[in-house]
């Protein structure tokens, strides 16, 4: 896909980012990963993010990432595959070029590694990554990489392939300023942990879609919530929040890192051999797995 095509795809429905499957020794498990991605693509996700945050990008070696992206592309069908990208500028450029070579339809540029940086430094970092590839780029505003509206506008002027802005700050004032300034130059994606909890607020700020973590294991329910959100059916949204998302949030909040670990546990409970999370994350306890299994309930995948 060219940048404009991936921009259009991003805005055409609910998005998600598959967990990365590992075997018992912690190596990438390509067969079970492909099975899972193929299942998710069947729920009409227009774009899936391979090796993203929920895909444990932070624990992957750079040379594992194109292998994961290629595996996703093999089975995704009409679903576009966007790759995670990040770390320092030179590593990010290498990752971006490597995934472009294996067919990635775009990259999601996650925050750079560790250090805080001024706006001019963020500008230089993102510009260099964007200009290193021809595919579309989405920037992820969160943690130590928070672009202000003027910086983002400069990047849009310099980088035609910068087509998406994903927010994980929760700063509605900032994101509303950005949507007002940039208009339809970018596609806007919600990126808070368990994004459904914030979806109504972000919709009001001009974010028409988001990446759903729970789509990994209850894609039908995730689609139901998204359809109700876009149709303005607030009573349906509230019912699903109360029945599923708030109890899921309670499990997620029991330990740091469970925003990833709980999703991976859900994938295993749906019959996929997703394997454990990599350190420094930890898997759910048996008690917590039981809580999650009860919550999945009638949304269990049919064998």
Swiss-Prot record:
Swiss-Prot/TrEMBL catalytic activity: 5-dehydro-4-deoxy-D-glucarate + H(+) = 2,5-dioxopentanoate + CO2 + H2O
A GO biological process held by the record: D-glucarate catabolic process
The keyword Lyase belongs to this UniProt entry's keyword annotation: yes
Molecular function via GO: 4-hydroxy-tetrahydrodipicolinate synthase activity; 5-dehydro-4-deoxyglucarate dehydratase activity
Pathway: Carbohydrate acid metabolism; D-glucarate degradation; 2,5-dioxopentanoate from D-glucarate: step 2/2
Highest taxon listed in the record's lineage: Bacteria
HAMAP family: KDGDH (MF_00694)
The protein's name in its UniProt record: Probable 5-dehydro-4-deoxyglucarate dehydratase
């Amino acid at each position: 896909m060219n940048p404009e095509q991936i921009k259009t795809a991003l805005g055409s429905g609910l998005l998600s980012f598959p967990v990365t499957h590992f075997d018992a020794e912690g190596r990438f498990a390509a067969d079970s990963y492909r099975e899972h991605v193929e299942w998710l693509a069947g729920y009409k996700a227009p774009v899936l993010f391979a090796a993203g945050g929920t895909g444990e990008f932070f624990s992957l070696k750079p040379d594992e990432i194109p292998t994961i992206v290629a595996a996703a592309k093999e089975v995704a069908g009409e679903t576009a595959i966007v790759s995670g990208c990040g770390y320092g500028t030179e590593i990010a450029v290498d990752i971006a070029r490597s995934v472009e070579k294996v067919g990635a339809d775009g990259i999601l540029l996650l925050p750079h590694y560790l250090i805080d940086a001024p706006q001019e430094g963020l500008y230089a970092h993102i510009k260099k990554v964007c200009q290193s590839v021809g595919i579309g780029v989405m920037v992820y505003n969160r943690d130590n990489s928070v672009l202000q509206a003027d910086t983002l506008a400069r990047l849009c002027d310099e980088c035609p392939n910068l087509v998406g802005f994903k927010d994980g700050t929760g700063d509605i004032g900032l994101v509303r300023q950005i949507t007002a300034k940039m208009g339809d130059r970018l596609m806007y994606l919600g990126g808070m942990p368990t994004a459904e909890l914030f979806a109504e607020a972000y919709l009001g700020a001009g974010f028409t879609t988001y990446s759903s973590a729970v789509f990994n294991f209850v894609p039908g329910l995730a689609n139901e919530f998204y359809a109700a959100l876009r149709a303005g059916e607030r009573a349906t949204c509230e019912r699903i929040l109360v029945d599923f998302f708030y109890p899921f949030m309670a499990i997620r909040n029991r330990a740091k890192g469970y925003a990833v670990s709980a999703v991976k546990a859900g994938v295993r409970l749906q019959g996929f051999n997703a394997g454990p999370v990599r350190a420094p994350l930890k898997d759910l306890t048996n008690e917590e797995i039981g809580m999650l299994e009860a919550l999945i309930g009638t949304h269990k995948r049919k064998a």
